[in-house]
Amino acid sequence: YIGLKISNALQVLRGEKTIGIKLNEVSQSYPVYVDGIPYIYKNDNYEIQMKQMIAEFAILANSFVGEYLKLNLDGKGIFRTCEAKELLSNMYNLSGNELLNEIIMNGIQAEYLSQNRSHDLVGMPEYSHFTSPIRRLSDCVCHYLLKYIYLRKNDNNLIIPFSNDELNILSNRCLYAGKNMKKIQYKDIKFRLIHTMFNMLLTREDITLTYFITSYSGLFLNLIICKIDDHDVHMSYTIRSRKFNGEINNHHKSVKITKVKCLQTYDEGCIPELERHILENP
């Protein structure tokens, strides 16, 4: 209970600096497997509160470490940044889901830098990734730098473990690895959601998909499936077409589908009724 009160207070403080806290309103459903059978699950209120509490404490720790590195290493280190204050300033009246859609449409993304910059989505002037050294390289680098700062108090001749050039290289590697892992994660989510939809259609006639279109290159039409029936989800999907002449915006459209096919190398053909609906009703 005390932890929840503290995390709520931290969220209020962040809310004075960023509209990014509205993303806490977004609670997406996800596939879970029971005895090998997938179904779609939505966290209950208690689970949502616990996850938000953990997230707030992680943000506090990451921002504290980011500031500590900046102050003790003359602004150098490895920082998680997202300079988007100007874009975000036009989105104050949006809901959490609407904000998420705008972030996707505008390509707002965080990156890693070896020089400190603000992270406007979390509302912090300094921010690092520190809390997960088991799974992220950037967090390991932060731990090495913190250890160096601690040890040099007793040894002024101690050499910093990474040069400025090495920190820059590591930042770029972290950025590349992070993007690569997200691609893998998106494919994994897509596979599991398609598997879940297939399983749902074994016991019912249809399901309703809600989607919006994010971009069109002249060949590849990219969209986000944001709802399966009443479940909020986030699933990217790409269709190949040279004849699309519809609008590119985050206006939601819906379609009922009665079948899905196994995910292949490309998305095309997995949800044929969705593809036909989009191309025939641009």
Region spans (language model):
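Internal insertion modules embedded within essential enzymes
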Residues: 259-282
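Electropositive polyanion-binding surfaces
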Residues: 1-244, 251-258, 263
